[in-house]
């Protein structure tokens, strides 16, 4: 399937499984009359495969070592991309950032690394399913920076176009999206 056909098919899946209209309170606390819940798309076999493929292709030239983001939205996405990257002989390891460190065990903020792995000096992409203000991805980026990682990009599947671009610019974080909310609001 061509990139444009994959993108169109994924948009259809998002529209059918993950986009809705109706009053909702977003993670940012804002109210909205439309929403995206990408978990049904990320956990659908075809949706996961297309998200991984399009994301992997968007990152192929960025020489990325790790991909991850804030739990929960980034977890299935980072895992799917890591698996596909292995199959494409261009491995990108996955991790996730806890919203708050566990109060037992190793008390880690960044999870998924082995005892011998570190993000120190590694090129990292922060992924997110849906971005509104950018707050969640910025929180993940701060944890990665504290662990020594170098953020090369924040990549979201859907940008709600509600201030994230400006927030990422202010935080010194390059930002791209696969889709913009306006693409779904037209239909």
Curated annotation (Swiss-Prot):
Belongs to the purine/pyrimidine phosphoribosyltransferase family. PyrE subfamily. One of its GO terms (biological process) is pyrimidine nucleobase biosynthetic process. It comes from the Bacteria. It comes from Rhodopseudomonas palustris (strain BisB18). Orotate binds at residues 132, 160. The gene is pyrE. Keywords: Glycosyltransferase, Magnesium, Pyrimidine biosynthesis, Transferase. This is Orotate phosphoribosyltransferase. Catalyzes the transfer of a ribosyl phosphate group from 5-phosphoribose 1-diphosphate to orotate, leading to the formation of orotidine monophosphate (OMP). Homodimer.
